[in-house]
UniProtKB/Swiss-Prot annotation:
Organism of origin: Prochlorococcus marinus (strain MIT 9312)
Single GO cellular component term: cytosol
EC number(s) stated in the UniProt entry for this protein: 4.2.3.5
Name of the molecule in the record: Chorismate synthase
CDD domains documented for this protein: Chorismate_synthase
Catalytic reaction list: 5-O-(1-carboxyvinyl)-3-phosphoshikimate = chorismate + phosphate
Gene that encodes the chain: aroC
Length: 365
């Protein structure tokens, strides 16, 4: 099972939903980088369970412990180890699921592959695994902000069939976090919240779409063929729990356009390193390499698989059974997935920034 990600800026996560704790080891972070621990905690608080009545009622404070790699607010260049201890585990909630495969959950495929799985909370398939990613991503966000003034903003674009209309030029973190669903469109955010609450009362769930905008992206990130920037972003984001789709730039809607309509024309510039385009259908990446425009992406999340409705399934012996989940689960993962998307995008960009400097840094004037 692969639990590591990245080439130079490399993370390895560990832990399980109902084990002693979860965490991450971040290797390859440059030395003497200023790190604000409060900003790491802020990102974890945005991901934390029990933060509102549209998330899981599991009550965890998710306080970060820095075990190594940072001293007096500066990185040492050595591995950064971070840990969050689990405090509100209830493995007993899953006694009836130990040998039963939840529909559309990883229980069945884990059992098919390994012949054994951590029944309580889904083990490594739990969203609690993302704590390590979010902590490491918070370090990556500070690296990108300090070195390039790069800003990563993600928000809930759609919940179920309720879509939003957001002015990307005016989007800000304060607007995103102004409500519990993390949709900056005030007109529809209340409707989204009501929909999630209604489905929660029914013992059901829903999915949706998160949109991500990255500003002040350095040009030249990414490499041709197998290490294209959008390919690595897709892999990173599709590795998050419950993701089912990835789109960059015009995405699938671009297939309805002609080349003359879709092409992003370049604008004359005295500085070729600051080349700009009249449109951004490419989503900030061309030929697998960032062009300096904003990176724009959308990520689709399926409805939460574990629900409170009775469902037909089979057990480990292949016998048909009826099951009804008793654990604490999100009726919709999207409000808490926003910082997860931020984190994975930050990790990819930080890794490619270091890779680009390693390959091309010495050759630049």
């Amino acid at each position: 099972m692969s639990s590591s990600f990245g080439k130079i800026f490399r993370v390895s996560t560990f832990g399980e939903s109902h084990g002693g704790g979860v965490g991450v080891i971040l290797d390859g972070c440059p030395p003497k980088l200023k790190i604000d621990i409060k900003l790491i905690q802020n990102e974890l608080d945005r991901r934390r369970p029990g933060q509102s009545d549209i998330t899981t009622p599991r009550n965890e404070d998710d306080k970060i412990e820095i075990l190594s790699g940072i001293k007096e607010g500066l990185t040492l260049g050595t591995p950064i180890a971070m840990l969050v201890r689990n405090k509100d585990q209830r493995p007993g909630d899953y006694n009836n699921l130990e040998q039963v495969f939840r529909p559309s959950h990883a229980d069945g495929t884990y059992h098919l592959k390994y012949g054994i799985q951590a029944g309580s909370g889904g083990g490594r398939a739990s969203a609690r695994e993302t704590i390590g990613r979010v902590a490491a991503g918070a370090v990556a966000k500070q690296l990108l902000k300090n070195l390039c003034n790069t800003e990563i903003l993600s928000w809930v674009k759609r919940i179920h069939d309720i879509d939003s209309d957001v002015n990307k030029e005016k989007i800000s973190l304060n607007k995103i976090d102004s409500n519990i669903v993390r949709c900056p469109d005030e007109k529809v955010s209340a409707e989204m919240i009501d929909r999630i609450k209604d489905l929660k009362r029914q013992g059901d769930s829903c999915g949706g779409v998160i949109e991500c905008l990255v500003r002040n992206v350095p040009s030249g990130l990414g490499m041709p063929v197998f290490d294209k920037l959008e390919a690595d972003l897709a892999k990173a984001l599709m590795s998050l729990p419950a993701t089912k789709g990835f789109e960059i730039g015009s995405g699938f809607s671009g297939t309805y356009l002609k080349g003359s309509e879709h092409n992003d024309s370049f604008i004359k510039s005295d500085d070729i390193s600051k080349l700009r385009t009249t449109s951004n259908n490419s989503g900030g990446i061309q030929g697998g390499i960032s062009n300096g425009e904003n990176i724009e992406m959308k990520i689709a999340f399926k409805p939460t698989a574990t629900i409170g409705k009775e469902q037909k399934t089979v057990n480990a012996e292949g016998k048909e059974v009826l099951m009804k989940a008793k654990g604490r689960h999100d009726p919709c993962v999207l409000p808490r997935a926003v910082p997860m998307v931020d984190a994975m995008v930050a990790l990819v960009l930080a890794d490619h920034l270091l890779l680009n400097n390693a390959q091309c840094g010495l050759m630049k004037n």
